[in-house]
Amino acid sequence: MTTIVSVRRNGKVVMGGDGQVSLGNTVMKGNAKKVRRLYHGQVLAGFAGATADAFTLFERFEQQLEKHQGHLVRAAVELAKDWRTDRSLSRLEAMLAVANKDASLIITGNGDVVEPEHGLIAMGSGGGFAQAAALALLQHNAELSAREVAETALNIAGSICVFTNQNLTIEELDSAV
């Protein structure tokens, strides 16, 4: 499993993830890159779930971004429709977090496209821990940057969740929101 966190604050949007890949109860890799930039560096995307499935979804999402000239919401809705109705895609087990300067979204295989409250996404096995940490930091420390909130939340999740480590990949964009 994994932990992915995205935070919007003070004109920035940040997305980060840990690097652990597990097979059952065994750590197979500790430095996987689960967050990346798509569509000419304008979109951040991260995944939780089966790695091979996530790469398929990244590829499909990037195709939708190209098809819709980088329009994040439209591309997300079209991917969710395909994911739900295409027989081969419907068996994929992963979730995507995507963000650009305007919006942050979670895309699921159930056809859900959700824009979370507070500009905060936290998902994966350590998502609950990371969400609690990030919300506390956002509500009680106005001086921390989006990057500092995301990094701290991921490190806290990595210290609690056995399927999350503290080898982080963090990407950042300027935000319109």
UniProtKB/Swiss-Prot annotation:
CDD domains listed in its UniProt record: protease_HslV
Please give the Gene Ontology molecular function terms for this protein. Answer: metal ion binding; threonine-type endopeptidase activity
* Gene3D superfamilies with a match to the protein in the record: Glutamine Phosphoribosylpyrophosphate, subunit 1, domain 1
Where is the catalytic site? 2
- What EC class does the entry list? hydrolase
Entry-linked InterPro entries = ATP-dep_Prtase_HsIV_su, Ntn_hydrolases_N, Proteasome_sua/b, Proteasome_suB-type
> Which residues of the sequence carry a binding annotation for Na(+)?
158, 161, 164
**What Enzyme Commission number(s) apply to this enzyme?**
3.4.25.2
Q: From the UniProt record, list the reaction(s) this protein catalyses.
A: ATP-dependent cleavage of peptide bonds with broad specificity
Q: Where in the cell is it found?
A: Cytoplasm
Q: What does this protein do?
A: Protease subunit of a proteasome-like degradation complex believed to be a general protein degrading machinery.
Describe, as the record does, how this protein assembles with itself and its partners: A double ring-shaped homohexamer of HslV is capped on each side by a ring-shaped HslU homohexamer. The assembly of the HslU/HslV complex is dependent on binding of ATP.
Q: What is this protein called?
A: ATP-dependent protease subunit HslV
Which gene name belongs to this protein?
hslV
